[in-house]
């Protein structure tokens, strides 16, 4: 069994999915484009908008593949290559190389790094992360997900000690973490380009139960204070007056672009 084949299979299936959408009604589509003298970039972007394809993505793909001739003359092989380029641009992938503590896994991980250089590939052990969280849940250890160590705080039997020692030696010390939190962080903040935002007050960061900043909202990088207001509640957006950066205590306007981990207080008309 070669896990790299799984990656190739997934790529192929996605490429064929895109190709199937492109191929369906292609002759009719290109005939209309020619008859109405449409811009192929705009026409394709509109046709594939459900896949998050835009004009810029189409233009780049056409440029890479040097599809200078009319779309009516594009052959099946060229359409497959176009489908692949569009898939790469609209479906970024991260590979979670799970079971990294299994014998032989390190070799496969190194092979994957060499073969799939355009992907983020993270070594991880979901089983180790689960074991650590279960031990934490039962007050046996102190552990923060994503960190490279844990502290034993409870009574353990020999089997539990051996299991934790195995995780420490073969996962945490070898790869610096279990990889699970890193997979989530990379996927959300790098691939999807989200930022984390917290609603809070200049003079109050706790809720009625004493929890500090209990709520976190994920939004696209580039989101504004007004976007955040609408995300919290439509009425907040409609009645927006100003926002306050809680850390700096500076007043910011509706067009202020928010940064990752900003704490924002909103002022709205009642």
Each predicted region: which residue ranges?
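Conserved nucleotide-binding/hydrolysis micro-motifs of P-loop NTPases
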Residues: 1-4, 15, 99-103, 126-131, ...
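Canonical P-loop GTPase G-domain recognition
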Residues: 21, 27, 31, 36, ...
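Short, basic/aromatic beta-hairpin or loop at an interaction surface
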Residues: 203-208, 232-245
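Short, contiguous acidic and Ser/Thr-rich linear segments
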Residues: 208-223
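Residue-level "contact hotspot" at macromolecular interaction interfaces
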Residues: 218, 257-258
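Short acidic beta-strand-loop surface patches of small beta-rich interaction domains
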Residues: 242-257
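Loop/turn positions that initiate beta-strands
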Residues: 261-262
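Short, charged beta-turn/beta-strand-edge "cap" motif at the junction between a beta-strand
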Residues: 268-270
């Amino acid at each position: 069994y070669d896990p790299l084949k799984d990656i190739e299979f997934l790529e192929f299936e996605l490429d064929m999915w895109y190709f199937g959408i492109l191929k369906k009604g292609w002759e009719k589509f290109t005939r209309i484009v020619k008859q109405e003298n449409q811009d192929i970039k705009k026409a394709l972007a509109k046709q594939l908008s459900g896949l998050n394809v835009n004009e810029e993505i189409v233009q780049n793909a056409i440029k890479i593949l040097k599809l200078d001739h009319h779309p009516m003359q594009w052959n099946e092989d060229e359409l497959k290559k176009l489908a692949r380029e569009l898939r790469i641009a609209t479906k970024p992938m991260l590979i979670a190389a799970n079971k990294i503590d299994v014998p032989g896994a390190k070799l496969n991980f190194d092979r994957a790094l060499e073969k799939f250089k355009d992907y983020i590939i993270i070594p991880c052990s979901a089983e180790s992360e689960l074991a650590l969280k279960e031990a934490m849940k039962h007050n046996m250890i102190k552990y923060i997900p994503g960190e490279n160590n844990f502290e034993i705080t409870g009574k353990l039997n020999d089997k539990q000690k051996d299991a934790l020692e195995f995780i420490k030696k073969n996962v945490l010390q070898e790869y610096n973490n279990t990889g699970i939190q890193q997979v989530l962080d990379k996927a959300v903040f790098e691939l999807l380009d989200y930022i984390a935002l917290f609603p809070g007050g200049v003079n109050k960061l706790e809720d009625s139960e004493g929890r500090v900043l209990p709520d976190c909202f994920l939004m696209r990088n580039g989101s504004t204070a007004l976007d955040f207001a609408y995300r919290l509640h439509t009425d907040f957006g409609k009645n927006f007056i100003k926002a306050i950066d809680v850390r700096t205590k500076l007043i910011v306007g509706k067009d202020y672009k928010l940064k990752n981990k900003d704490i924002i207080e909103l002022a709205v008309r009642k």
